[in-house]
Amino acid sequence: MYRNVTQEIFMEQTKIILDENEMPKRWYNVLSDLPSPIDPPLDPRTWQPINPEALEPIFAKELIRQEMSSDRYIDIPAEILDVYRLWRPSPLFRAHQLEKDLKTPAKIYYKYEGVSPAGSHKTNTSIAQAYYNMKEGTERLTTETGAGQWGSALSLACNYFDLECKVYMVRSSYYQKPYRKSLMTLWGGNVVPSPSPDTEFGRKILKEQPDTPGSLGIAISEAVEDAIAHDNTKYTLGSVLNHVVLHQTVIGAECKKQLEQVEEYPDVVIGCCGGGSNLGGIGLEFIKDRLEGKHNARVVAVEPSACPSLTKGEYRYDFGDTAEMTPLLKMYTLGHKHIPPAIHAGGLRYHGDSPIISKLCAEGLMEAVSYGQKEVFDAAVQFARTEGIVPAPESSHAIRCAIDEALEAKQKGEEKVILFNLSGHGHFDMASYDKYFSGELE
C-alpha cells in the first residue's frame, strides 16, 4: 500500500506553542542540586575565594547575590516578565522536513530562540541584567560581544530601561557583520571594534599586535576597565557566569511543558557552547531530572574545533579576560591569552567555559564534541533548505550534532528523540554564507 509521507507529516503537530500564562515565572538554579558545590571564584589580587563585596564596583548587587545563591528557584520580577512577553514563550518545532530529508526514524525537535527582538537567546538575560542595574541606580552599562548577538540584546535592554550602553565588539566580527553594529546603534548602543583606542588595555594590544583579530578575552578586559573607570557604570557579561546561565533556564522549562503536550521526552539534548549559557538554558532542566533519578537524557555541548575549550582545554582556574582583571574561575580553558582563529561563529570564540557547564562535563553529566566550520555550514544549509529558517553559525553547531545523532539513529534503526536549541537566526551572517558558497571557508 502506498504511504503518503507528506500527508502523514501534516497530520502531526509541527509547532508547539504555549500560552503566555504558561511562561515560567521563576528561574532554576542548578547549584542547589549539584552533588558537590562548584569551586568558588578567586580574587585576582590574592588568589583566595573572592568576597562578594569585591565584585560591587563592576556588577549590580542583585546579580552578585544571584551569582552566589544556593536557592533552587529565583522568582522573575513582573517588570521582566512584561518584557519577556514580547516573544516568550518561544516556539518548539518538530523538524519534519529535515527528518524526511535524512530518512531517519528519529524525531527531531528544536527550540527557536531567534524569535526574540534581538534574534537570539541573549535577550533572556540582557533584560534581567539591565533591569536590576536600573533598579540600583546604574546609568550606563559596558559589555563585550563576539558575533554581536549579545551586544544587540544588551543595546535593546538598555533602550527599554533608559540606560547608556557601550559595546566592545571583537574586531574580526565587527568587520564580518557590519549590520550587527547598525542594529546596536539603532537601539542606542555605542559600538567600537575591540581592541580599541578607548581603553588603556586596548591601546596596549593595538601597539603590540596592530593586526590582531581581537578576542572575547580582550573585549571583556576593555569593558571591565571602562566600568571601573566610571562611577555611574557597571559591567555586564553575556555568558559564562552563574547568574547568566540562571536567566536562560526559561528555555528548558518551556521545552519540558511543550514536549509534555506531545507526550515526548528527549533521549539527547544539544546546544552549541562558547561560554555555555544557551546550552545551560536548554539542558539544565533535563540535568535536574537526571540528578533526581527521573530520566537519563544525554546533554551534549557542541563547540568549534578552532576553539575547543571543553574537548581539548584544561580544567583549572583561569582568568575570564586577557588583562587578568576578572576573578579566576574553575573552568575548562585554552588559556586566557589564547586568540582563536577568526572563524565565522564569532560568539563561540571564547577561551573558557561556564564553571557550571565545566563541572558537569568534568563529572560526566554532560558530553562535549567539536566540529570544523565547513561541516557546520553544510548542516546549516541543509537545515535552511528543509526547515526554512536561516540559522546563526553558532547555532548551526547544534544542528550539525543533531543531524549526526539522527543519522546514527537511522543506522541503528532507533526511534530516538532529539532536542536542540536553535539559539538564534543568521540574518546578519549572510556574508559568512557567501564565503561558504564561494568555497572560501577554511
UniProtKB/Swiss-Prot annotation:
The modification N6-(pyridoxal phosphate)lysine is found at residue 122. InterPro entries: Trp_synth_b-like, Trp_synth_b_CS, Trp_synth_beta, Trp_synth_beta/beta-like, TrpB-like_PALP, TrpB-like_PALP_sf. The keyword Secreted does not apply. Its EC number is 4.2.1.20. Keywords: Amino-acid biosynthesis, Aromatic amino acid biosynthesis, Lyase, Pyridoxal phosphate, Tryptophan biosynthesis. It catalyses: (1S,2R)-1-C-(indol-3-yl)glycerol 3-phosphate + L-serine = D-glyceraldehyde 3-phosphate + L-tryptophan + H2O. GO terms for cellular component: cytoplasm. PROSITE patterns: TRP_SYNTHASE_BETA (PS00168). The keyword Lyase applies. Pathway: Amino-acid biosynthesis; L-tryptophan biosynthesis; L-tryptophan from chorismate: step 5/5. It is an enzyme of class 4 (lyase). Its cofactor is pyridoxal 5'-phosphate. Tetramer of two alpha and two beta chains. Belongs to the TrpB family. NCBIfam families: PRK12391.1 (NF009057), trpB_rel (TIGR01415). This is Tryptophan synthase beta chain 2. It comes from Methanosarcina mazei (strain ATCC BAA-159 / DSM 3647 / Goe1 / Go1 / JCM 11833 / OCM 88) (Methanosarcina frisia).
